[in-house]
Every structure is written in C-alpha cells, then in structure tokens.
Amino acid sequence: MRILTKRKITEKAEVERKTFFDIVFEWEDIFSKQLNLPILARTEWEFGFDERCRKVYQKIKVPFYRLYSLIDRRGKNIFMFDCSTKRQDGIYNNSRYIPCLIDYFLSDEEYGKFLRAYSKNPLVLVSNRDVYEYLQKKGCPIPIEHFPLSLPDYYWNDEIYEKKYDLVMFARQNPLLVEYINMYENKHPDFKLVRRKYECGHYIYYLSATGETVSIGDSHEEYVKLVSQSKVAVYTTPGMDGTRTDANGWNQVTPHFLEEIAGQCHIIARYPDNADTQWYEISKICKCVESYDEFEQLMDKYRHEEVDLKLYKEYLQNHFTSKRVDMLRSIIEKYHLY
C-alpha cells in the first residue's frame, strides 16, 4: 500500500484550508513511517483534470475521467484521505484507490450519489461511526470499515501548561454557545476572553475587552499554542444547533476535541448522543450543556479549577494516532492490501 497526499496542492490554499489539512498530513507521515508506506504526491495537473471532467460530466454525461486510468502508473492499493465525501464519480473511483472519508455530510437522498462516486473502490474507510452504522443499515454494497480520526501522540505533554486566558474562541463556533459566551462576558467584566476574526486572509485573535491582537493564527502550531493557553474551551459537533448548515444532521467527533484535551482545557460542549459520540465516550470528558445557567456554573468553576491530567492522559491513550496505526495494519492484513 502507498499513500496519496494533497500537500503540494494545498501550498497555495487559503489559511483555513491549510490549517485544516495540517493534521491530515501529520497522520500521513505517521502511517508512512510506522507502516513503511511510501507517500505519493497528488499533482495539480491531475487535480485540475479531475475537476474539469466533473464539470463536463454535469453538462454532458460522458465520463472523460475514465481516461485517467489509462495513464495512471501508480499501481494498486493507494490509500488517500477524502476530506469531503464526493457526490460525483471521478478519477479516483477505481480499483486502485482506497479512500478514507473524513467528513460525510450527505443527506439521505444523496445516498445514491455516494454509491456512484465510490462504486469501483475496493474498500472505503469511514471515520464517523454514526455514518458507518448508517451505511451498514442501508446494506451498502461497497466494502466499508470504521477508521476513526485521531491525535498524533506527540501532542500530549506531561508538563502543566501556563494558562493566560479564560477562554479562546478557536475553531468553528456553535451559535448557541456564542450566545452563552456573550451573556457570560456581559455579566463578568473580569472574564478574559479571546475572540477570532478573519481579515485579509488571516485569522486574528484578539482580546474581546480591548481589541488588542494576541496572535495571528495562520499556522497549526500557533493554533495549538493558543489552545494550551486557554483555561476553558468550547466544543461542538458540526451539525449541532446549526453550526454547519451543510451538515445534514451529521455530528461526528472531530480532532478539535482531542486537541482541546491535549491542550489541558476544561471543555464545555454541545453534542448529541449518537454512535460516534458514544464510540469516543465523550461524556467521560464533558457533558452537553442544556442551558445558560448550566454554562455559567461550569464556566465559574472551570476558571478556577485545574483539569484532571490523569483522566485526560488515560483518555487520549485510546485516540492517539499510534492506535490507528494498529487499526490500519489490521485492515491491510484483512484485505491483503500489500
């Protein structure tokens, strides 16, 4: 097996996309090193060819993308992360490629599009346990395996972090939690809150009370540093309370949750009870707040209380990327993907 990466293509991408892909590239590097899997670069030419063929196919139903298989000399059993589940057939829908779906936000009506987009792949890995069980119940004819997302082992540090802020608002925000944060800030003038805005291609982190810039969060490293400086973090699954309008009700646990644990943050969260949140046992770390009063009580407590580092470390042992290396090795052996 080999790994196909998008890292060259994302070099010119906007900050938001680049920081999203950083952890994906870290997973790829770990899998490559631990399983001795060569990394192949996806080229801008093939990316452009795939995009153009898809656009043409929408107008005239001629699958020009099938021509790519005639010139593709990479061989078989090529693993690739698919950050967004495709709704349309393309150059990677053939027996050579094994996609791992990170985000699955298709509606039930789009199930047929999923089948067509991955019909020729010998195996599809699905990160969301809820989606995996949904596809099983649908009788999905494509071989699928559950392959959950993870956190590189080196993110954990036994050193106790010095906290500079009560709350840093990083990552995508849940509108209900934002409402609670605004209410809390108005009632507590001493609340040290860092907000985020996107200006001129950069994420600007600034103190809410003064407007003073504390960070230009253009890199994943700077993001991780900010997480480690926040006493409390708010977390939400994508489809909760309209956080992502395109989520179609899907709510999976994302790496942000694991990053907040590694950053030694207390976590106040909004999430549903589903197969994925149960698989991650998210309730061991945080409960789903149901009211502002509950939010306020937790924030008051967490601003003055240390986290349980022993609990956090033990929890992450099951979700480090080294554990996913073992899972991928088992999948390779099960399907003879050598």
Model-identified regions with their sequence ranges:
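Nucleotide-sugar donor-binding catalytic core of glycosyltransferases
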Residues: 2-68, 73, 81-90, 108-119, ...
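Active-site proximal beta-strand in glycosyltransferases
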Residues: 79-82, 90-106
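Pre-catalytic or accessory/regulatory segments outside the catalytic core
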Residues: 100-102, 118-121
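Active-site donor-binding loop signature of nucleotide-sugar glycosyltransferases
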Residues: 102, 149, 290-291
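A residue-level structural signature of the nucleotidyltransferase/glycosyltransferase Rossmann-like core
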Residues: 123-124, 287
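A short acidic/histidine/glycine-rich donor-binding loop in glycosyltransferase catalytic cores
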Residues: 282-289
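A charged, aromatic-enriched C-terminal amphipathic alpha-helix characteristic of glycosyltransferases
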Residues: 290-293, 297-338
